[in-house]
Curated annotation (Swiss-Prot):
MF term (GO), any: transmembrane transporter activity
Function: Component of the octopine active transport system probably consisting of four subunits: Q, M, P and T.
Cellular component, GO annotation: ATP-binding cassette (ABC) transporter complex
Subcellular location: Cell inner membrane
SUPFAM superfamilies: MetI-like
Predominant location category: membrane
Database matches in CDD domains: TM_PBP2 (cd06261)
Domain of life according to the entry: Bacteria
Domain ABC transmembrane type-1: 19-216
Protein keywords: Cell inner membrane, Cell membrane, Membrane, Plasmid, Transmembrane, Transmembrane helix, Transport
Entry's induction text: By octopine.
Name listed for the protein in its UniProt record: Octopine transport system permease protein OccM
Length: 245
């Protein structure tokens, strides 16, 4: 098949219309998933078995099954139950958009909860004991000592999870959501030019995730001033040392 720059450009422009919907799914599902993940992480570190076990089961279930299966269960499976169809949540569950968002949020919550748990457990026990010795209450200790350090530790893993969620929005096309991949599938059915269309879609996802990665790099730069200072001071010292040598 001959190379056709005009077709590639037209395809790229057509796929751009799917970006807002893809970003909506990614942003809202990550936000909802983060809230749920925080609760799950607290349950995991609570040292109370009746809180820890349900959180463990939830995380195991959603990490151990494919996201596509979860989307199908929510969109196709729940509608099989009459009680669900007559409940107040049915107006949402019969809409593919909300089903996709729910599946994405529930899935990312399981992964993010473990990232948060690792961040919470990374805070040195000595600092916690010192804060208690200074008379800090549990809430103040958590807010002033634990949370700031946990955020910095979990940020690299969390950024990877956000990037994965941006890519995972492509699975929403399997339940008729016309985001980037959904529009790509429609264009392929009309033109039969699979390679060109999916190459354009892949380029758009690559650009989006590059932007997300850079935003998290800037956030890490802002939250980790000692790394910034080390980077600014290390190079001049090394060059000076080489001159004296």
């Amino acid at each position: 098949m001959p190379f056709d720059p005009a077709f590639l450009w037209q395809t790229f422009v057509a796929l751009l219309s799917g970006i807002p919907l893809a970003l909506q799914l990614a942003v809202f599902s990550v936000a909802l998933g983060t809230v749920l993940a925080f609760g799950l992480a607290l349950m995991r570190v609570s040292r109370l078995w009746w809180l820890d076990l349900p959180a463990r089961f939830y995380i195991f279930a959603f990490r151990g099954t494919p996201l596509l299966v979860q989307i199908y269960i929510i969109y196709y499976g729940l509608s099989q139950f009459p009680d669900v169809r007559h409940s107040f949540i049915w107006p949402f569950l019969r809409d593919a958009y909300w089903c996709a968002m729910a599946a994405l949020a529930l899935n990312t919550a399981a992964y993010t909860a473990e990232i948060m748990r690792g961040g919470l457990l990374s805070v040195p026990a000595g600092q916690i004991e010192a804060a208690k010795a200074c008379g800090m209450g549990r809430v103040k200790l958590f807010r002033r000592i634990v949370i700031p350090q946990a955020i910095r530790q979990m940020l690299p893993g969390y950024s990877n999870e956000v990037i994965l969620m941006v890519k995972s929005t492509s699975l929403a096309s399997t339940i008729t959501i016309m985001e980037i991949t959904g529009i790509a599938a429609k264009l392929i059915s009309e033109s039969y030019r699979t390679v060109e269309v999916f190459s354009c879609a892949g380029a758009i996802y690559l650009i989006l995730n590059f932007i997300v990665a850079r935003l998290f790099t800037l956030l890490e730069w802002a939250l980790w001033p000692e790394r910034r200072n080390n980077r600014l001071t290390t190079d001049p010292v090394d060059r000076k040392g080489e001159l004296h040598a």
